[in-house]
Amino acid sequence: MAISRDAPIMAALGAAAVVGLGSEAFVASKPLQAQSAPSTSSLRGATTVPGSESFGGASRTLAVGAGAVATAVLGRGALLRRRATAVKKKGVRVVEGKEIPWNLFSPKAPYEGSCVSKETITSKTPLVNWETCHVIMDHGGKVPYIEGQSIGVIAPGPDKKGETPAKIRLYSIASSAPGDDESSKTVSLVVKRVVEVAGRGWCEYSNVEKGKDPEFPDAEKVYRGVCSSHICDLEAGDDVLITGPTGAEMLLPEDPEANMIFMATGTGIAPFRSHLRNLFHDKVSKGKFKGCAWLFLGVPFSESLLYDEEWKEMQAEFPGQFRYDYAVSSEEKSEKNKINGEMWVQHKMMEYGEDLWQLVKDPKTHVYMCGLKGMESGFAECFQEKVEAEGMVYTEFLKKMKKDKRYHVEVY
C-alpha cells in the first residue's frame, strides 16, 4: 500500500475487499482468500528460539533456565488458539508467545554505561522548558532491546524528596535496536530538560534556593528536573546508570504489510523514531517493510519540531510508504478546535479524515500514541462520527481495536 499526497490514500490501496470480523465490517487492502483476525503472536524483533538469540539485531546469549511451553489446539476451519505458560528466565519476558529482553538490569544492579554524545535539537522558545536533547549512550551490547521499549536512567540525586541516588526515571528509546551507529552497542534517548518556574506556568515544588538560580534569580520557586537535568548535562565520557529494558505496549507487529499511524506530542516522538529507523533506515531491515506509516507530530513552536529534517528526508526517499505531517499549536489555527482555536494533532489529522478513516478500518493498520494524554480523546474526536455513520458504536469499535491489538497507547 502506498501513501500519495496527490490523491486520496485509498486510491493507492487498490480494490478494497470488505471483510466481516465479528459484528463489524472493515476494509481490507486487497481481496483475501481467507481472513482471520490480526495475529497476536507476532512481534517485530522478538524471538522464540532458545539459546543464543538476537533481539532486533542486538545479540546475546540468554541465561540458562527453563523455557516457555506452549500448547495449541486447532479446530478444523477455526482460528488457532494458543495457551502458553512460561517459566521465568532472568532478563526475558514472554509476550504473546515471543521472548523479548526484559529488566536485564535493575535499580539495585544497574548497568554502568557512558555518554557517547549529546546534542541540543531544539532552539530557544518563550517556554522555560524549551531545551530538548538527543543523547547517545554506550551500553557495550549488554542491554539489548527491541524497538518500542524503554530504559531507565538513575541520576546521582538528590531528588525533590531528598533521596540519593534519585529514583529511576523511564524513557522511551529513540533509536532502533542496532542503535544510531548500527553497532548494537548504543541506545539513544530524546529528553526535555524539565524546568518549572513560579509565575511562568505550573511550579509545585522547588529544589533551587531562592535567588540562586542563575537563569531565574528573582523567581519565588524554581524546580529543575533531577534526571532530565542529569541527562541534558551529560558530556561525552560521563558515566550513566542504566536499567531495563522494559515495555511491551509499543512493539510493532511482525507482519511486513501492516500499516502504522503514529501520533506524537513532543518527546513522545521517541518510540516512533525507533520504529521508523527500523522500517526505513537500518541496513539490516531496510526494504523489508511493505506497508505504510503515517506520522503526526504536535509541538507548541516550530523550533520544537523534533527530527524534522530526518522525517522530511525519509518522506522524500519513501514517498509511497511514509508520510509526515505536523501541528504547531502556537503558530497554526484550526476551526475544529472549539477550546482555543489552536492546531492540535487531532485537528491536523481531521484535514485527512477520510483517508485516515479508510486506514483505521483496515485490519492491518495499527494506531500508536505517545505523549500527552489528550491524544486519546483527540482520536475519538477524529473518528467517532465516522464510526457511527457506518452504524457502529464507537466504544465497541475501540474495544475491537484493542482486542485485535491494533491500538497502542503510552500517554501521561
Per-region residue spans from a language model:
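Metal-dependent catalytic core segments for phosphate chemistry
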Residues: 187-233, 238-239, 274-277, 286, ...
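Reductase modules of NAD(P)H-dependent flavoproteins
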Residues: 88-93, 100, 105-111, 240-249, ...
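N-terminal organelle-targeting presequences
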Residues: 39-151, 160-162
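N-terminal chloroplast transit peptides
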Residues: 2-54
